[in-house]
């Protein structure tokens, strides 16, 4: 899962249920780059819904410096925990050549702020996007999404302007 334009929750629970019913040995990964700051009661809880790996960006709806995160829902001793160990050992040093220590304090402060204010922040972000979408529609614009839920479940609003016209 994961994409740049996100109006709705991803069907993580439905996919988890399907692969489990089919007996498929699979790993569900959810790239939450654009919606990481909405994770929780106001949007989606991917680990509780069945995702095993979550990646994200700390500079979009999570309002910190430009960094990335990887988290897993594996416990030490489980067979798939080896996947986490591989990811962890190859991230730094390895694929990442600079861990940018100068941004870590900013990320820490953003994390503290998110922990303190996330409920109000997340609710406001989604509410503002819904209000914006309704206002655009009322002004005559072609707003994408389901009007029954005010067009969006996230921070994003999409306006159809025509192919290659926007």
Where do the PLM segments sit?
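Conserved PLP-enzyme active-site core in the AAT-like
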Residues: 1-142, 161
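Conserved PLP-binding catalytic core of the aspartate aminotransferase-like
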Residues: 143-166
